[in-house]
Amino acid sequence: MRLRHKPYAMDRINEYSHIVIGNPEESAGNWKEIFGNEQPIHIEVGTGRGRFMYDMAKANPHINYIGIEKFTSVVVDALDKLIEEEVPNLKLINKDAEDLTVFFAKGEIDRVYLNFSDPWPKNRHTKRRLTYKTFLRNYEEVLVDGGEIHFKTDNQGLFEYSIMSMAEYGMLLTYLSLDLHNSDYEGNIMTEYEEKFSSKGHRIYRVEAKYRTEPMQ
């Protein structure tokens, strides 16, 4: 994806620092205070232009959401949605998710969403995939005991790699669909990419995986 430089982006992000949290490492352990309530917190790693998080937050006001996106020129589009109509249970972070464990305290997050992540198809780039074991360990660190990952992609190779990576890590796969849009799954909220790919006839793959609270026998 080619990103268009937006010279105004940082100024806008700084102006709305109550939405895009500028120094998230200073907020670790205090996110419920930032939201002003005790509601559960769900995060999306690689939130892109924010449609999924925006729609999820609107549909579920009893849950707090945080979208994490490293590209400034992309996250500013997500911010623009919230400037037009602020959603109090949604915040954004403009940082790389590799630093996830410094943004949140242990057990502070209830669920992680990974939607249409970069597949990094070359073997030498395996460690960059957001379902590589190092990332799975980081998610586990910030999730509550028994926390979940919900993952969607149109890339069959990444999907197969991801379910294998999760299983090898010891996670429990609680839901799996090889063709989400032709399944009986209810309540699916689409991302921008999902709408684009599915309209072209691409299959959408989905898996929900849960961290085990007890070691496998």
From Swiss-Prot:
Domain of life according to the entry: Bacteria
CDD domains in UniProt: AdoMet_MTases
This protein's pathway: tRNA modification; N(7)-methylguanine-tRNA biosynthesis
Entry-linked InterPro entries: SAM-dependent_MTases_sf, tRNA_(Gua-N-7)_MeTrfase_Trmb, tRNA_methyltr_TrmB_bact
Binding site for S-adenosyl-L-methionine: E44, E69, D96, D118
Gene Ontology CC entries for this record: tRNA methyltransferase complex
Top EC category: transferase
EC number(s) on file: 2.1.1.33
Residues that hold substrate according to the record: K122, D154, T191, E192, Y193, E194
Coiled coil spans: none
Classification via PROSITE patterns: SAM_MT_TRMB
Catalysis: reaction(s): guanosine(46) in tRNA + S-adenosyl-L-methionine = N(7)-methylguanosine(46) in tRNA + S-adenosyl-L-homocysteine
Active site: D118
Pfam families, alphabetized: Methyltransf_4
Keywords attached to this entry: Methyltransferase, S-adenosyl-L-methionine, Transferase, tRNA processing
Gene Ontology MF terms: tRNA (guanine(46)-N7)-methyltransferase activity
Role summary: Catalyzes the formation of N(7)-methylguanine at position 46 (m7G46) in tRNA.
UniProt record similarity statement: Belongs to the class I-like SAM-binding methyltransferase superfamily. TrmB family.
Official protein name in the record: tRNA (guanine-N(7)-)-methyltransferase
Record organism: Bacillus mycoides (strain KBAB4) (Bacillus weihenstephanensis)
